[in-house]
């Protein structure tokens, strides 16, 4: 697939990874993560903080912060990053809209926050990991983490963990310790999974 006069070439396999990963994320967020009662690290968690502290709408602050992260990503990672991210973001929204038409598969998870946090992290970690592996970012958090890695040459799990820990620590200003602990488990596990999926080696077929 050729895009623009610069002839940016998109890999069909990477497009497929972005679409599959985003769909997995949407499935997990709708059927599991939304039932866990946990907060978030990263940009989503920061929008909740700003809403609590300054009464600013997450719709506004989320848009501004995500746009800023994607702008940084574009500057450091190029147009192919933006195109793969657009595919990932569109697929996520479309998939979530489809899943919303059906009842949640495991409503009982609402009474098992620890289990929901772990299972939800699996969906988020694997889904986002596939997108990042393909070179796209389904959210501003992913764009920021990928940009930091490009500059520092560090493992992608480090910026995920750092931003999540910072936001969760600040969230103690309005959330109880138990909820923060469950949230910490979710973001740490999902961040580690993203790094694992991104770096996993796929065996080459012989022949």
Segments (PLM) and residue ranges:
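Core subunits and conserved enzymes of cellular information-processing
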Residues: 3-207
């Amino acid at each position: 697939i050729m895009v623009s006069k610069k002839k940016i070439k998109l890999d069909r396999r990477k497009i497929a990874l972005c679409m599959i990963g985003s769909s997995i994320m949407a499935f997990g967020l709708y059927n599991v993560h939304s039932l866990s009662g946990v907060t978030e690290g990263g940009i989503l968690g920061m929008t909740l903080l700003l809403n609590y502290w300054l009464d600013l709408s997450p719709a506004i602050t989320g848009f501004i912060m995500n746009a800023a992260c994607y702008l940084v990503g574009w500057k450091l990672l190029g147009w192919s990053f933006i195109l793969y991210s657009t595919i990932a973001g569109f697929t996520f929204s479309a998939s979530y809209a489809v899943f919303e038409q059906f009842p949640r598969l495991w409503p009982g998870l609402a009474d098992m926050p620890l289990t929901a946090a772990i299972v939800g992290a699996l969906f988020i970690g694997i889904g986002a990991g596939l997108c990042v592996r393909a070179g796209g970012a389904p959210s501003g958090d992913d764009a920021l983490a990928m940009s930091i890695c490009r500059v520092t040459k560090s493992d992608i799990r480090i910026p995920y963990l750092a931003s999540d820990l910072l936001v969760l620590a600040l969230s103690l200003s309005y959330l109880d310790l138990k909820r923060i602990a469950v949230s910490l488990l979710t973001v740490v596990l999902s961040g580690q999974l993203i790094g694992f999926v991104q770096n996993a080696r796929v065996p080459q077929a012989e022949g």
